[in-house]
Structures are given as C-alpha cells and as structure tokens.
C-alpha cells in the first residue's frame, strides 16, 4: 500500500458504501483498537475518529479475499468477524449482531462485484484471549470478582491499602485510581498451566508515596492493560509506543504499575520484567543526554543486560523510562562502590553518609552481591536514580527507619497486612528537582519494596 492512499479524509470518501465504529485487532502485541471504518468499493479504510483528515490504515479487498463470522472461544467478543487478504487476516468486532451482519453483507456485496465471494480462505489463526472493551472511558463493571482467601496476594494488597490514610477516604480520586487499576488485573482463572501473576508493592519510609505493580503472561495481560490506560486517559501515541517496544522485545511476561501520593499524585505505566540487552532498553527510551551517559557508563563498567524496562503513560511529556539492572562486581563492597560512582557520574547528589554507612557496616550480614540500580531517564534529563539492596536484615531496616524518622507502628501494620514478611529490597533513591510536580517528594528518600506473592494457575 502506498502512503498517498492514506492521505484521504472521511468526508472525501462520501458517499461511502458503509461507515461506522468497529473494533480491530492490530499491533505486534495484539491489542484491540476502536476505529471509524469506511467501506468504499474494494477499499476498507479505518480512521482514529470520523473527523480525521488522514486514514490510519487500509484493507484492500482482492479477488481471493473473504469475510466470515468468527466465534470467540471466550465468548467475550460475541460479534466478531474476519476479513482475509493475501497478506493478512484482520479480526474485527461490532457492538451488535445486526451491525456485524450488515458490515459482512456490505463487504460481501463489494467483493461479489468482482469475481464473487470466496467461501474458504487461508487458515485462520486462533483469536487471543481478550477480556474487555478498549473504549477510552472508565469501566464501571471491572473484572469479575475473585473468590480469594485472606492469604491470597489480591487480598493482601487490598488489606495493605486500608492501612494507608489517604486511601481510606471514600471520595478520594487516588482511591478510585487504585480501584480502576486493581480491576484491570486478569482473574486467576485466566491463567494457563504453569503460569502465574505476581504482585509487588513499595512504600516510601514515611508511607506518603506508594507503588503497586503486577505482572504475568502477555497473552492475558495486554488487553486489560491497554483498557486500563484508555480508562485513565493515556494518550494513544503512548499506547502505540507500548506496541512498538513490545514488538522489538516480544516479552513473555508484562505488567502494569501505578504510583500515588498523599498529595494526590497519580501516575501509571507498563513494564516488562524480562532479561534483555541493556542496549535494547536504551533504544526504547527517549533519546537525549541521559541515555548517552547511561550507555557510556554501562559500557565502561561491563553492564550488559537489564532485568526490567518500564515506561510511564502520563498525559503530558516528558516521558519517563525506567531501566533496572544488576551491578557487576565480585562482592557487596565492589558493587556498592560502583553504585556510588553512578550517582556521581549521572550528577546526582551523593547518598547521605549516615545511610551509606549503615550499608558499609552491615556488608557482612547483607546478601553478598546482588545490588541493583534503577535509572529513570527522560528527554529533559535524568529523573531518578535508585540503589536497590536485596534482602535487608531486620537490623538494617530498623536503623533505616530510625534515620528516616519512620512511623514504625504503621509500617508494622502494613507488613502484617502483606503477610508479615519484611522488605524484599530497600532502595536509596533520589528524585531530581522539578520532577516531583508538587505531589512527590524530591531529593533523597528510602523505599521499602515487598514481594506480596503470586496467583498460580488453578
């Protein structure tokens, strides 16, 4: 298809043979998009809206093309049909059975005008599991309620939420945001044998900022994630970016995260918790001085791979991309010194001496090696840098609570709600000035990360 063929508006195609809203599967990660379709002769155009002056795409109907009704095995897209060409089979669904049949009849009629309909066709690939409508509005119904025990990770994160004062206010927009996100998590019943959904939560030491994360198999997560991003107003360009990065990395596991604060901060995004070359992660980030510095530092210190890449889906730029990787080095001290060097190289203030001293003094009791770095970049500069220390001892956690003036009682209640385990990681992080947007604490902070648990396939 030539680009000039797309340079046509909806109005220029009038009178059309048929037009209206349909939802089409597209992208390398098979998400569903609502599009305004216009059938004109043997060309089926689709637009992002009915007022667009240029088409998003075009399905060219050929002599051997076909159209037929499809049965979605999960019965969640009842009125689905396919349009097949020599290059691809397009999966499309309508809102009603009548609409579906009228579209199919119109396409058949236009096909019959030149050689007639083909009843057969190419082999049809199986439809993926799609779980909710991708319309940019809040899903009032949400996921079907799970019958979960008090020990399930879903129950634990819900219980932990109730410990947080700013998440107990009934009219809270932040609470509503949390609920929309939690309803976007696929049900346990969607899991296939040998797969799982993992749950994580992190809190700043003063418990005024929290991060919630969940991840699982790509095939059951992707559509619910996209629906969540639509529902909270993420721009379509960033949903396209998710598809583009997903096509490059093709992760088996994907997930979503949300940040929130007592000052009304609400942010969300996606992440791929998979091992990939760091160069690939940097290519997925917005180019700029930070990515250049990170690339040079990583190369000089033999940092080759990362274990997670994520990105925010906020309504306005600059976009932020987080990369996490393990620090090389023969032991804890060598890795800690390398982390200190990273703070200096990336022009962050040094980790406060009292916090750093706790690590040096406890190096024999902390896990040998295993230190990780979290780097968040944007086109406008480094955003945040974090040093992640795995399996901190109770003594280390206690000392950090002391210097961070933590509310020990509230943290204890929070941990009890999560099942009684201590942090899986403690993070020393620094948020650069200007990136707190008045709702997140800028400067140095201590964050506790918890692995809440997993939903296993039944």
Curated annotation (Swiss-Prot):
It comes from the Eukaryota. GO terms for cellular component: cell leading edge; cytosol; early endosome; plasma membrane; recycling endosome; trans-Golgi network. Residues 143-154 have a biased composition (Low complexity). InterPro entries: Boi1/Boi2-like, PH-like_dom_sf, PH_domain. SUPFAM superfamilies: PH domain-like. Residues 111-154 are annotated as: Disordered. Residues 124-142 have a biased composition (Polar residues). Residues 15-112 form the PH domain. GO terms for molecular function: phosphatidylinositol-3,4,5-trisphosphate binding. GO terms for biological process: endosome organization; receptor recycling; retrograde transport, endosome to Golgi. Pfam families: PH. This is PH domain-containing protein DDB_G0274775.
């Amino acid at each position: 298809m030539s680009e000039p063929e797309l340079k046509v508006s909806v109005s220029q195609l009038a009178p059309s043979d048929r037009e209206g809203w349909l939802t089409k599967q597209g992208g390398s990660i098979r998400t569903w998009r609502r599009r305004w379709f216009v059938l004109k002769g043997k060309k089926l155009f689709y637009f992002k809206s009915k007022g667009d002056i240029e088409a998003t795409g075009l399905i060219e109907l050929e002599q051997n093309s076909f159209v037929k009704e499809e049965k979605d095995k999960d019965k969640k897209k009842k009125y689905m049909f396919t349009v097949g060409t020599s290059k691809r089979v397009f999966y499309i669904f309508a809102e009603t059975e009548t609409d579906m049949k009228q579209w199919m009849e119109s396409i058949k009629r236009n096909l019959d005008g030149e050689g007639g309909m083909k009843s057969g066709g190419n082999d049809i690939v199986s439809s993926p599991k799609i779980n909710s409508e991708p319309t940019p509005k809040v899903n009032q119904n949400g996921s079907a309620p799970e019958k979960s025990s008090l020990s399930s990770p879903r129950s634990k994160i819900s219980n932990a939420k109730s410990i947080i004062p700013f998440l107990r206010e009934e009219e809270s927009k932040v609470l509503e945001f949390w609920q929309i996100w939690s309803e976007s998590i696929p049900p346990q019943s969607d899991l296939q044998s040998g797969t799982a959904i993992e749950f994580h939560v992190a809190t700043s030491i003063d418990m005024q900022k929290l991060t919630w994360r969940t991840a699982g198999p790509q095939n059951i997560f992707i559509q619910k994630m996209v629906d969540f991003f639509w529902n909270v107003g993420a721009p379509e360009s960033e949903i396209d970016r998710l598809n583009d990065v997903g096509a490059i990395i093709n992760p088996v596991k994907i997930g979503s995260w949300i940040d929130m604060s007592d000052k009304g901060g609400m942010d969300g995004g996606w992440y791929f918790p998979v091992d990939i070359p760091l160069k690939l992660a940097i290519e997925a980030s917005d180019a700029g001085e930070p990515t250049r510095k990170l690339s040079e530092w990583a190369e000089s210190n033999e940092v080759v791979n990362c274990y997670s890449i994520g990105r925010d889906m906020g309504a306005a730029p600059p976009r932020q991309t987080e990369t996490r990787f393990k620090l090389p080095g023969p032991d804890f001290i060598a890795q800690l010194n390398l982390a200190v060097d990273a703070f200096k190289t990336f022009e962050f203030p040094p980790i406060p001496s009292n916090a750093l001293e706790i690590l040096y003094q406890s190096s024999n009791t902390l896990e040998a090696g295993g230190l990780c770095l979290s780097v968040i970049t944007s086109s406008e500069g480094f955003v945040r840098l974090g040093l992640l220390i795995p399996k901190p001892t109770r003594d280390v956690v206690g000392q950090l609570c002391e210097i961070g003036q933590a509310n020990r009682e509230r943290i204890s209640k929070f941990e009890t709600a999560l099942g009684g385990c201590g942090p899986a990681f403690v993070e020393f992080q620094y948020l650069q000035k200007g990136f707190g947007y008045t709702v997140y604490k800028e400067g140095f902070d201590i964050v506790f990360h918890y692995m809440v648990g997993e939903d296993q396939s039944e």
